């Protein structure tokens, strides 16, 4: 198998893995309402938590993070065997993230990508993932806005990557992932600017 064909297969497999929406799968398995039908309508752990089922929210968070990490880890493990270079890994990063945002198995109605991005970053470099998670935690603790923490972390993640690994195709993939994540938070940005965004621990505010 040529490296080009292997890269295409890796990317396609990553997209399909990313397309598994754990918010939807876990909710169905536990007899809960589809998370796309209540709260923010976002199929993610934060919205699943609004169902009142903490276990479902935790499973969603872990599942979404694990799928991102698994896709990238498998690609990195198999890459040397098929001659796939860093460009291929970069494509896998984007593919699994796009799978989460636009899942083929769930009518292309995906989440915002925070947990999946965390899993991807941890798989690329544990210290990169931990630095980004620490950034999220600091912002979340001081400002108590989950969305703001995600946005700030997304901005810093590409810089952390470059500091640790230098400029390469994967750095570009991390930057693109950050842009996509920020774009998925457009409504949250508008609410933050209007002072209507819910803080961590508060009930969702009216739009």
Curated annotation (Swiss-Prot):
Q: What does this protein do?
A: Catalyzes the transfer of an acyl group from acyl-phosphate (acyl-PO(4)) to glycerol-3-phosphate (G3P) to form lysophosphatidic acid (LPA). This enzyme utilizes acyl-phosphate as fatty acyl donor, but not acyl-CoA or acyl-ACP.
Specify the pathway.
Answer: Lipid metabolism; phospholipid metabolism
| Protein name, UniProt field | Glycerol-3-phosphate acyltransferase
Organism superkingdom = Bacteria
> Where is this protein localized, as stated in its record?
Cell inner membrane
Give TM regions.
Answer: 4-24, 58-78, 86-106, 120-140, 162-182
Is Membrane given among the entry's keywords? yes
Q: Which family does it belong to?
A: Belongs to the PlsY family.
Per the record, membrane topology reads: Multi-pass membrane protein
The species this protein belongs to is: Ralstonia pickettii (strain 12J)
Q: By which gene is this protein encoded?
A: plsY
Q: Which reaction does it catalyse?
A: an acyl phosphate + sn-glycerol 3-phosphate = a 1-acyl-sn-glycero-3-phosphate + phosphate
Reply yes or no: does the keyword Transmembrane apply.
yes
Chief localization: membrane
UniProt cross-references to NCBIfam families, sorted A to Z: glycerol-3-phosphate 1-O-acyltransferase PlsY (TIGR00023)
Regions annotated as coiled coil: none
Provide the GO MF annotations for this entry: acyl-phosphate glycerol-3-phosphate acyltransferase activity
Q: Which Pfam families match?
A: G3P_acyltransf
Q: How does it assemble?
A: Probably interacts with PlsX.
**Where does it sit, as one GO cellular component term?**
plasma membrane
* EC supergroup of this enzyme: transferase
EC number from the UniProt entry: 2.3.1.275
């Amino acid at each position: 198998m040529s490296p080009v064909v292997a890269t295409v297969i890796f990317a396609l497999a990553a997209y399909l893995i990313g397309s598994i929406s754990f918010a939807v799968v876990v909710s169905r398995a536990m007899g809960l309402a589809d998370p796309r039908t209540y709260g923010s309508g976002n199929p993610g752990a934060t919205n699943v938590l609004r169902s009142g089922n903490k276990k479902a929210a935790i499973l969603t968070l872990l599942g979404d993070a694990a799928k991102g990490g698994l896709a990238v880890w498998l690609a990195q493990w198999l890459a040397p065997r098929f001659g796939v270079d860093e460009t291929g890994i970069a494509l896998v990063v984007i593919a699994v993230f796009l799978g989460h945002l636009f899942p083929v198995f769930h009518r292309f109605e995906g989440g915002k990508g925070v947990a999946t991005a965390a899993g991807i970053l941890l798989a690329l470099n544990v210290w990169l993932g931990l630095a980004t998670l620490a950034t999220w935690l600091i912002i979340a603790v001081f400002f108590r806005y989950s969305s703001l923490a995600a946005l700030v972390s997304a901005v810093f993640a590409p810089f952390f990557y470059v500091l640790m690994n230098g400029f390469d195709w994967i750095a570009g993939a991390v930057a693109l992932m950050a842009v996509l994540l920020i774009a998925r938070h457009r409504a949250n940005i508008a609410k933050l600017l209007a002072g209507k965004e819910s803080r961590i621990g508060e009930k969702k505010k009216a739009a």
